[in-house]
Amino acid sequence: KDENYFLYVGNMEKRKGVDILIKAYRRYREEGGTRPLILAGKMQEDDIEQLLETALTEVEGLTYLGYVSHTTRYDLYNNCSCFVFPSMAEGFGMPILEVMKHNKPILASNLKIFDEVVGDCVERFSLAGDDDDKVISLVNGMKNIDKKINSGLVDENAYRHALDKYTPERLGGMVRDFINSQMNNR
C-alpha cells in the first residue's frame, strides 16, 4: 500500500542527518514538491528540536510523530512511498533492511557501509561538500524518487538477495566466528 509520503524513522540527531533532511524537505517544498514527509523517532538533540519546531510551523506537509511503537513503525514502513535515510554515520544500517522487507523504495546517503549492506539496489544521494551541497543532493534525490515512484523502482530480487545476507542465523554465525577468531588469536 502507498499512502504517498516520504518517511524517516530513527533517532532525531545530526549524525543521522535529520538536520539535512529537514532543510532538504523545506527546499523540496519550495521547489514545488508535494509529497508529505513523516518523521518518527526519539528526539536526541536540542538544536534538532528547535530546527524541527520552526519547520513544523513554516513547511507544509511535515509531520513529527515522536517515538513510535514497533507496530506503528511497521505500519509506517508498509504505507510509505519511500524511506529516506540520510545518515552521516552508521554502524550498519538496520532500518534499511527493515524497510526492504516491505519492498519500498529507499533513498539513502552514500555511506560506504551501505555499499556493503545493500549494494546499488537503493537510490543514493551524496554526502560530499558542505551542508548546502548535501541538501541540494538530497532534494534532487527526492525529486528523482517523485518521478520514478510508479515505475517499478524496487528490484525485489536485489532486495531479497540483500536480506538473505543478513538473516538472524547468518548474523549469529558471523558473530560466533568473529569471537572464536579473537579467542584463537590470544
PLM features: residue spans?
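Short hydrophobic beta-strand element within catalytic cores of glycosyltransferases
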Residues: 105-108, 112
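Short alpha-helical donor nucleotide-sugar binding micro-motif in glycosyltransferases
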Residues: 75-80
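Nucleotide-activated donor-binding/catalytic signature segment of Leloir-type glycosyltransferases, i.e.
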Residues: 49-74
